[in-house]
Regions:
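Intracellular loop-helix junctions on the cytosolic face of multi-pass helical membrane proteins
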Residues: 1-132, 147-148, 152-161, 165, ...
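Membrane-embedded alpha-helical bundles of multi-pass transporters/translocases
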Residues: 84-99, 105-109, 136-156, 160-218, ...
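Short helix-loop-helix connector
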Residues: 114, 224-228
């Protein structure tokens, strides 16, 4: 062990995170001129929580080796495994920022489209307005899961490609980005004055749902296998935070768009604000997928499935 008072860098990092989180909440309460007006309590509180978790995680990682000899090695290794999984979770938050907007941004886009009642295969008795397209997601999930398990994954294995959990999750993030590119192309057509059928939205829904199956279901299995028995409940709790922080990315982006300088820049691109944001979120997903792939190549897999 280090001498008393030495090697406490992790404590300083964690303390800095706590102080910064408190400072952010105080800044929101006082409302100085330099604090963004669009950062209300929800955004500020989520940012403060993110800073607290990030700095706490880094600080804990730096201090873990000091705990050996005081705490059992298994306990120390369990905490380190949780910290590694949290990085994986953090890299999936951009996916949720895209996925959750299907119930808002995509519905708004769909309301500008024409409902194709004239198509013989269109279920007019089920889909009478854009919001009802949401029912396509759970229906596709029930089809895609058995397709992946019975057809896609065995086919990949026969080709010598093992669809590991991390590979599936990274691919799922990419598919979410592709879905938003398709949605952006549809938005360009709408902005150009074309009459676009709501049926075209089936493609981004299909791509996004395929990504959801690869990310969401796989991540739960992955986290369960990586966490030790004592930490499985903890890791599940952190998983539910990924959706929260995914929504935070959307809040921050929308707050940034309301800035005059950003609005002026969007105008120079020739795109509408909606189209610009769709392509922005697609790029955000691709950047996250690259970061995910880089980390996944270095991730030391564990096997902590329950045997009884």
């Amino acid at each position: 062990l280090s001498k008393q008072g030495e090697g406490r860098t992790g404590l300083y990092v964690a303390a800095f995170g706590g102080a910064l989180a408190v400072f952010m909440l105080m800044a929101w309460a006082v409302g100085p001129s330099w604090w963004p007006e669009d950062f209300g309590f929800v955004i500020t509180a989520c940012l403060a929580l993110g800073v607290l978790i990030a700095c706490g995680g880094v600080g804990t990682s730096l201090q873990l080796e000091r705990a050996r000899g005081i705490h059992p090695d298994d306990t120390v290794d369990s905490v380190r495994a949780v910290l590694r999984v949290l990085i994986v979770f953090a890299l999936t938050t951009p996916f949720w920022s895209l996925f959750d907007q299907k119930a808002s941004t995509w519905v708004i886009q769909g309301r500008a489209m024409a409902i194709p009642h004239e198509l013989w295969w269109w279920p007019s008795f089920l889909v009478k307005e854009a919001g009802q397209m949401q029912a396509l997601n759970p229906a596709l999930v029930m089809l895609i899961i058995p397709f992946n398990n019975l057809v896609l994954y065995p086919a990949l294995r026969r080709m010598g490609v093992e669809p590991t959990a991390l590979r599936r999750m990274g691919t799922g993030i990419v598919f979410a980005g592709i879905a938003w590119i398709v949605a952006g192309v549809l938005q360009l057509a709408l902005d150009g004055g074309a009459q676009v059928s709501l049926a075209w939205q089936m493609w981004p829904y299909l791509l996004l749902t395929f990504g959801e199956v690869l990310v969401s279901a796989t991540a739960l299995e992955f986290a369960y296998s990586q966490a030790t028995q004592a930490m499985k409940g903890v890791i599940m709790a952190f998983w539910y935070l990924t959706s929260t922080f995914g929504s935070l990315w959307v809040l921050l982006t929308n707050a940034g768009v309301r800035n005059d300088a950003v609005t002026a820049h969007i105008a120079t691109t020739g795109l509408s604000e909606n189209a610009f944001l769709m392509f922005f979120f697609a790029a955000f997903a691709f950047a996250a997928a690259l970061g995910f792939a880089w980390y996944a190549r270095r991730y030391p897999m564990q096997d902590n499935y329950r045997t009884a």
